[in-house]
Amino acid sequence: MCDAAAATATTTTTAAVAAAVATTTASVALEATATQPGTTTTTVATASAGTTSPEAAIPTAATATSARNSNSERSARQNCCRLCIAPQTECISIINSYAADKEPLSTKIHNCVGIKVTPQDRLSQQICHACISYLNSWQSFKNRCFSSQAKQRQWLDTNKSKLLNYLDLNSAENGGGGFFDQHLHQQQQHHQHLENELEAEKEKATPTAASTAANILDGIHSLKKRKSLTVYPLPAMPIKDEPIDTDDDYQMKSIDESDDMVDPTMFLERSEHEGDVPLTASDYDYTAQHGVNASSVAASLPPNAVANVAAAGDSKVASCRACSLQFSTRANARRHERNLHPNLFQLSTDSPHNTPITKPTPALAAALEMQRAAAAAATAEANRAAGAAGGNISTQKYRQVVMNAFIKCEGGGYDYDNPEQYRPLLTRDKVEFIEQNDEFLEQYQTMTCRCCNKYFSTYKNFMAHVRKKYPQLPRNLCFNCLKMNDSKALFISHLKKRNCINLFRVLNALRGKTTTVVVPIADDVADDGATGSIPVADAGAGVVAMNSPTVTASGEVVTPGGGSERPEKLRAKELLVNKLYECKLCPKGFRTKHEFRTHVYDKHADVQRKDNNSIQCSFCGLDFADPVDRRRHYNNMDCIVRLRCMTCDAKLETHQRFLDHVYQDHLGGVGGGAVSDNASTTGSGMARSNSMEHSPGKRSLLGALGVGSSAEESRSSSAAPPLTSTPKLAGGNQVGGGGSTSASAAAAAQSSANRDASAPKSQYFSRMPQVCPICGQQYNNYNNVLRHMESKHPNKLPETYKCVRCGLGYPRISYLREHMINVHGVDKNRHSGGFEYIVNADAVKLADGSTPNVYTGRYDYVMKDLMSITNGGTLDDEEEEPGSVAKKMRLDDSSNNSSLVGVASQQKECPICNAVFSNNIGLSNHMRSHYTASNAVNAALAAANRMTPKSLTITATPATDSELGVGGTMSESAPATPANVPPAMANQTPQEQAVFRRSLDQAADRRFRRMRCRICQRRFSSKKSYRYHMLTDHQVQNVQFIKCKLCNAEFAYEKGLKVHLFKVHGKAIKDEMIIKQFECDVCSIVYSSESELQQHKRSVHKLTSASASTSASTSSKIDDDSLMDDGKPTSSDLADLSTLAAGGSTASAPLYWYQCKYCPSNFNTNKKLAIHINSHDEFDSNDYSCKDCGNVYSGRKSLWVHRYKKHPQVPNPAECSLCRKVFFDRQMHDNHTPTCNRKPITSTGAHQQQDGQLHSHHTAKRTIFRHKTGDDDDEEDDDEQQQLEERANSDGNGTTVGVASGSTAAAGTSLKIRIPEVACTICGARFTDQEHFSKHIQKHEQELYVDNPLAAMFDDGPADAGQFQVERQNENGEYACDLCAKTFPQVIALKVHRKWHFRGDSKQNPIDGEATQLTNNNHTTNNNNNNSMHLRELHAVGLMPNQQQQSLNNSCNSSMNHNNNSSSNRSKSMKRKRELKCEYCASTFISNNNLRRHMYELHKHEVSNLPEPPVIVVDDHLTCRRCQLKFDTKELWIEHKLADAKVVRPFCPFQWGCDLCGEYLSRKEKLMNHINNHLKEEVIVPVATKAAIERTAAMESAAADANAAATLSALGEGAETEDQFAEKVEAAGATTTDKLTNPDEEDSDDLDEDSSGDDDDSSGTGDDDDDDDSDDDEDGEGEDEDEEGDGGEGEDEEGVQPPAQLLPQQQHKTDLNLNQDDDDLVEEVISSDDDEDDDGEVESDDDDEDDDDEEDDVEEPEPVGLTVRPLMNGKSKMPPLIVASSDDEDDGVMPIEDIIEEEFDEDADPDPEDAIEEVDEDDLDEGEVEDEPNVVSTASFSESESSTTTTSNSHSHSHSTGERRKKAVDQLNDPGFTCDLCQLCFDSQELLQSHIKSHILNGPKLSTVSAAAAAAAAAATASSKATALLTAAKAKPDSKSAVLANNNNSKTSSKTVAAGATN
């Protein structure tokens, strides 16, 4: 209704004004003004609107200009807030806006306050944000709205008055009169009458509205602009979070916190459950809340107390008299009092004019009087503190003391002297919270940070500062009453009450009353060496308002005769940093020097000028002769700055004086002056002052370099809160207050004090000040000391860091790093994160001359992920326990010489070498040094003196027995214990030793426990950092970790867990865990099943079913992280033509499709090309984008895996018309064409040198091109062409494929383009581009660091993911090859493997040349020598027969080809082909050993005749037969067997035997896993029974007897002597064969777990796919020695010598036909070679490159007639029994079998019986071979690793015998191709090559007696066709045998056999 009246009045006024423009008179205006409503007494503050009051705006004479001004004012007023007149800038439109509940604002306003807002209103249609939030706040808001309406109407009336006045003046001037003016006057009267009625109705509705409005508007002129968030006229602001503390604002704010708080009207809308009491209850209703009678309290007040309070309420301060909340006006304050504190105030009319006023109740008067008394007491105490400080106290300090005392006095009506009544409030959760956060709550009591001694006036600033240290504190929790508020608004409202109980004080008061153990203050002072006087301030600080009986003190009440509470110690760091830089030019102070310098440059730039090179300071006038001192003076601004000690408020001129002051006064522990100064800073006797207690003495503090406290003492002690609390006083007046301890804590403090009474005080801080050992100058850290010494004492620098290579010492590790890089050539990228060095203990002695008793060196450059992480590499950044090491990882001394009690639990001793370390980090990193040389168990079994200098890491300082209390530390050269075990294991039981070994394993294995990002290969030491990396760098959210079920280890993905399970828990990794995939060998597409792969080959590649099935059988199982097939090289042409040849396919698809854009190499699969490109430096390491889809990847491996899987392209070959290269598709061809600058050549060019092959090529229309790679050269191609020519001449078969190592086609080399080349002298690789060659050389230079032991320790590589590096570990701790997908467990294995990628044959060029020359010179004179040289050449070319072999084959039948041979020898290249091809799959290998192992492991079921290892005699239960030990439990037994398996040698190639069940496994890792599995078996069942062994022995004996009979009857005339000899040998062989003990063949399936599937990468061993001989390097030193093939020296691990039965036969052979000199020579060569093999552990880790190269290197100087290096010589990397015939080189004195038996006679088997049987049978086989030199044993023609080790050698011998008999006649008629090793002839080159491979696989098992028996059987087969037919069924169908060529070779072979038998 009021709105309607207002609208009517407004309309009427507008019409009147429009009608009276020309006739209005002044009298009307005056009368209208007089008739205004009676609201003119209200004054309006228009500051916020930018105008003045309406009264001041009424002119006596107005002009048109003034009218326009009033119109603008009106416009401005109409745009203000409709409800509160807030300025327009803070308003929004009412019409088009909505409230939070989606209700239109106009409706909201009408419903809430009854004001209807319409678009037609003349009043404002704007509303401010504050009013929107207030709409539903409180009922009195309507009053304000009504007042605003009246105010706006008044403005309208004022405007009308001004207008009427203006019109009146005009009418007076114009003489106008009359009627209209009277009419307007009547209208005005009517309008005023309506408004009077409206006001009357409003007053009836709200009788107090008028007075309220008056109160609201009263005092508006006194408005002040404040920073507080008051309501009017400033806008309301949102509640902000706690600000970030800048730590430089030290200006103390007002004690009143209202400046930082918001208007409580924001929080009035509360529910009952949100508060402690009903809303109607008073906040100070003591009867309701605290049980205190307010009336009794008020009665005790002075009579004038209430009057004083009432008078205070009438003061000009607009604040609430109950909660001190300030408001902009007194009216708002009174309204707040009535609404929020209705029970504390009452309306009274006792005013002079009988106006109702609000008066406080007596209860409130009592509370206010308490506060006033407390304030008076605080002021008095502050004055006393100022007097105690001698008047030297700043205003800031004075205010701090006053505030502390006031807070202590604000008891809120709680009786803390009797805390028992509040015990129910202390729930268990609250007590636990107080105990956990004791340190923080203690600081919260005084709002003072303990670290920086900084006081904060408000809760918000204090919490913003301390949350840095206590980030886990909950939000919205009151730390007094521990009430958790639902919202921040409620929390702030709760804080402003300031009347909640302090539970921390209650708990401490209760503890103080129950404490029985009390530490007297006198004892503490005596312990500290301080005087017994008590500071004045401390003594009186706790006495607060003692004259007022109603005041409850919250501080410590101390009797006049008592002492203060013992202050808490202040750490040295806290004292040193507790300073302020004050400017002498202005009163400002700054916390840091940087801020001060910035201030000077900004504000006083004219004063502080730059150095003018004058000796005199331009400001202070001091003279500085030394330019260094002058510049330091200028830079430090010494003449402008003044340092203030914030601990005691002392001012010092220089920083040095400040340091002296802190050391002397605060850390020295003597002098009362410092005590009083300190006491004056903290006030109120709280435990923040100074404390000399536990203060280290100055001398010990200035002790030397890095000696300090343990990390746990130098860091926060929040983990043990009772220890941080201080003991109570000795008196009985111990009252509440922050710091009492429990009985146990007090007792601990007492014992600590007693211990520290005699101990120097250097153990409380780890970063103690340092002193120059030359001049005694003090500095606060070691680096500053070094900086001083470098400038002042450059010739006396300490040699703290010593080089491990040359022993030079340097004071800084950075100098050592530069030395290592510049002098020793260490790659600087390898040492960015870690460095290995020896710390010179002599350089870090203490300043007083004493030597620290534990390791005191600095280890600054240790990566964090090398910390002692114990949960699988996923430990979070927070330390595990309170005593964990500091994050800086400075291994400082944790004690000094006499503090033995504290250091006993902190010393960490190395169990291997007894080096002592101060914490786990030093020990963990030191343990890694032991693990580098060998694994953990070998390190434990090795003595300390076995460590070579290369494995040194940290040298511990020796200590005497008296210092350590233990036996002292052992240096690296200390002798081992007699038992050859570490000292820590000397007195342990076997069970303890087993546990100890396992702990060593786990400790050393920590280097594997790091997480690696599988996308970018970065490593992380914690899950937190890994998650952050994945989120920020790869946008991967919700990273999940796979947790081990057996321990707390977690892994990023499954592979890490698999490896962890295998390595740590010994869990077998099953085949079903490996995803089986089938890869197309043509295009590398992977399929999930074999049928899909075959269908793909048939449809896409047009392969027949036979070829498809053949190729499908070669598909490998590919792991997700390793897409490489085992054994495939990556830098050569790997064409898989064997499958095409097997199927007889003549498909026209080209051989090479993928062309490298950096070199001429090309490949047949995309995968191979991608791997090859990754080896190029030209490959842009920063460009990892897919050219097909545009995806960008983090590394090249990720990119090529993506292309390999996602973009398998269909071949569309395109040939370059210039260079004839064939590309995979047109795009690659188009990319190549612009860069091709070669002349066009045609298929009829100069390269067509072989007519037959060329014709065959054109007939087949095969588009085959061969381009040069690092392994090819022109000479090789010439050699291959000659081979093809000779082959064509010999058999006419020009279409044969697969001749050379499986990657060259029939005529592929005929089209090769000759380009000028340059060869690498290191690896032999050849290049046509000089730039490529230069970058290749750089690779070798970067490989140099591999030989550095530092690199072997730290595997952190260059930061660039694409940068070349070798030792990059993956997440499982394995080293990944950067050229392929293989991983290795040790860096030495990776080193060997990488050489395999870049290997070349240039080292063997001289050997080849000499070998060729020797062959040419001696070919016509000694056929035996020819044979041996052909053995060498055969080895040199791998398995590919060359022209020498062809000529030798011809010479076996005719002597016409000698000249031909010589010419072909002269044209032989100095470089030899190295690729060997598997005949069962498409894999190619670079060494025979790799091929041999491949056959053993992948094709064991495809090869029928494998040499079998001996049957293992199983150990009895809980008994070790080898060691003759018995065990109590199965666990100890298995543990012992595991330890033994790590060092045991294999029984035969790739055959590690299990003594528990007799099973053989192909790898040592599998053996250990197998033994581990026995632990889970209840009963261990052997793989073969005795009955099976006896049956097998009987069968083999019968077969041998039959062979012997056939041999005796089939001897010819020309071999009588041989027949007699063979008869004797055969008889001996038959006798010994009866003793054979081999299990049945039906057991062959027992070990299927060792099939090819186990060779996959995901098996967890990490090296199963290693193609070189280093797969077992990780197994330790012991095995490496065994792998060297050192049997020649008679070293036998089991101590079993060769059987005695062999001697008669050997002697018999020697008497018959042995050249003793030759035999001695052979034996001598073998022994010398074995000596070379035993050179050392490091040499044993070389690659199989050395296997082949070193053989020739050693044999190079030998004459023709001497014995060439035997089979195993030079095989330093091979397992001891892994030998191959093709690796052997002989000069003809001894065939390869003799060398084999030489090797293995001396390496006897563990079991004497087994060894005898094995040797006998092998001798039988060998005898057959040697008695008939022209027949070869094919016993292991295509062998692979057979898990069944049950087929005996006699069985193999039967096969080979039958084979020879079958083919004897055929080979007489057709010489064909002859084997140089055994003179056996074959029809084709393919068969010969397959046969030669059998020599590789057949050799290792031969021994002396078996060789003799084999020779006899072979002699029998020469003439016994019937016997051959009987055994032909056992021979391989496609193996075609031949007969002997001549008698000369037969006799020579017999001699050799005899020689071998004698040995």
Swiss-Prot record:
Residues 79-155 form the ZAD domain. The modification Phosphothreonine is found at residue 246. InterPro entries: Matrin/U1-like-C_Znf_C2H2, Znf_AD, Znf_C2H2_sf, Znf_C2H2_type. One of its GO terms (biological process) is regulation of transcription by RNA polymerase II. It comes from the Eukaryota. Residues 178-208, 674-762, 960-991, 1233-1301, 1445-1471, 1627-1865, 1933-1959 are annotated as: Disordered. Its main location: nucleus. Keywords: Coiled coil, Metal-binding, Nucleus, Phosphoprotein, Repeat, Zinc, Zinc-finger. Residues 1255-1267 have a biased composition (Basic residues). Required for normal development of ethanol tolerance. Relies on two distinct molecular pathways: a cellular stress pathway defined by hang, and a parallel pathway requiring octopamine. This is Zinc finger protein hangover. The gene is hang.
